[in-house]
Each structure stands twice: as structure tokens, then as C-alpha cells.
């Protein structure tokens, strides 16, 4: 049964003192990697030798899978891991459609070359945005402080910065906006698998 709307207590939700608890957050790790410029030359060299793989890319060039460069090994936050990587070179009006990285634990990207005025952000989608569509919208309408404090959005986009690296759960759906620049946007993406550990719960 649909209850009638009670307009007599409109201020109650605003005045009630609640603690917002970010339960089951999606963790995105961010760091910077110096001396990455040599990887740009490697990406261009491979493009002259390899045809593009077709995966999530809409246009652009996607290299073959290969070992993760030793340069990045010390930035992996795990003592044991296995992984592969690939280069992406996107030009004007090229990007990546929404996807995940199945059969992996973590995924990541290191931005190598980022043209100005590109617009090619990396967007992450809320893992349960469709089921929680109204919950997210209503909380953000009445309590925008929760949205800002806990990134309680339907989607969140990171602007790429050369030398910056993100790592995120491989199941977290994401996409890359079309590049609006005429210069190349180059990145190194990777997948990480980890050994099975004892389950930890509260």
C-alpha cells in the first residue's frame, strides 16, 4: 500500500543527526610514477609492428598483452602478484566503451601522454547504480554533504594526468570518454591477479 505523503515533517530529515557509514566502498588507489617517458617510445615502436587488438577500444590502437614493465613493479601494493599489460593510443574521437576486467583481481592504468583540452576522462560507474538509482538521487538531493564526502555518485570521472597511475578492483565498471584532441592520448593499462588468501570478515 502506498502511504499518503506527509508534508508536516518536511524538515525532519534535514534536522535528524545521522552518522553516514561508507559500507563496502570501492577502493581506487592513486600514485605517481616518475621517469615513465621511455614507455611512450615503446608504445609507438610496438604500434609500427603490431595490428591493433579489438577489445573495449572504439578506434585507436590496442597492443598485444605483455609483461608489466619492471618500472612499475615497485608500485604494486602487494608482495605477490601476476599480471599483464597493454598500451593504448587513442586519437581524436576515440575511446573505450564501458567494461570490466573479468578473471582478474585488480586493474590499473598509467597515463603516459595526455594532450591539452582532450576531454578523455576515465569514468567509473557505481557498482549498483541501477538498483540504487533513486536512493542515490534522493540522498544527493537532500544531503549533498554525503555525496561530496563519500563520493556517493552514480558515476565518477578522473581526468588523466601524465605520470599518474590508478589501481582499482577489476570488477569496477569503467569507460574512457572520446578524446577531443588531435594529438595522441597514450596509456599503459594492466591486470593483476593475486594468490588466494584466507577470507577476512567482521
Functional labels for PLM-detected ranges:
Residues 2-79, 86-88, 93-96, 121:
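Non-heme Fe(II)/2-oxoglutarate
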Residues 85-87, 108-110, 188-192:
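A structural signal for short, well-ordered beta-strand segments
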Residues 86, 99-101, 174:
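Histidine-centered active-site/metal-ligand motif
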Residues 90-165, 184, 197-202:
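Catalytic core of non-heme Fe(II) oxygenases with the double-stranded beta-helix
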Residues 94-95, 171-175:
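Histidine-centered metal-chelating micro-motifs
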Residues 112, 172, 192-194:
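Short beta-strand segments enriched in hydrophobic/aromatic residues
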Residues 173, 177-187:
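Ligand-binding loop in jelly-roll beta-barrel domains
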Amino acid at each position: 500500500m502506498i502511504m499518503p505523503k506527509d508534508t508536516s515533517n518536511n524538515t525532519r530529515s534535514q534536522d535528524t543527526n545521522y552518522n553516514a557509514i561508507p559500507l563496502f566502498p570501492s577502493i581506487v588507489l592513486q600514485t605517481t610514477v616518475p621517469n615513465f617517458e621511455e614507455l611512450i617510445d615503446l608504445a609507438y615502436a610496438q604500434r609500427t609492428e603490431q595490428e591493433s587488438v579489438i577489445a573495449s577500444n572504439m578506434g585507436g590502437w590496442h597492443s598485444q598483452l605483455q609483461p608489466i614493465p619492471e618500472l612499475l613493479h615497485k608500485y604494486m601494493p602487494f608482495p605477490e602478484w601476476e599480471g599483464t599489460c597493454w598500451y593504448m593510443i587513442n586519437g581524436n574521437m576515440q575511446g573505450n566503451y564501458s567494461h570490466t576486467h573479468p578473471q582478474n583481481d585488480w586493474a590499473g592504468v598509467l597515463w603516459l601522454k595526455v594532450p591539452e583540452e582532450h576531454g578523455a576522462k576515465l569514468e567509473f560507474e557505481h557498482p549498483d547504480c541501477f538498483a540504487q538509482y533513486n536512493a542515490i538521487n534522493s540522498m544527493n538531493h537532500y544531503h549533498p554533504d554525503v555525496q561530496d564526502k563519500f563520493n556517493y555518485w552514480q558515476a565518477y570521472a578522473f581526468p588523466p594526468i601524465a605520470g599518474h597511475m590508478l589501481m582499482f578492483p577489476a570488477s569496477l565498471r569503467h569507460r574512457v570518454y572520446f578524446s577531443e584532441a588531435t594529438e595522441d592520448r597514450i596509456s599503459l593499462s594492466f591486470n593483476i591477479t593475486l594468490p588466494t588468501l584466507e577470507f577476512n570478515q567482521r
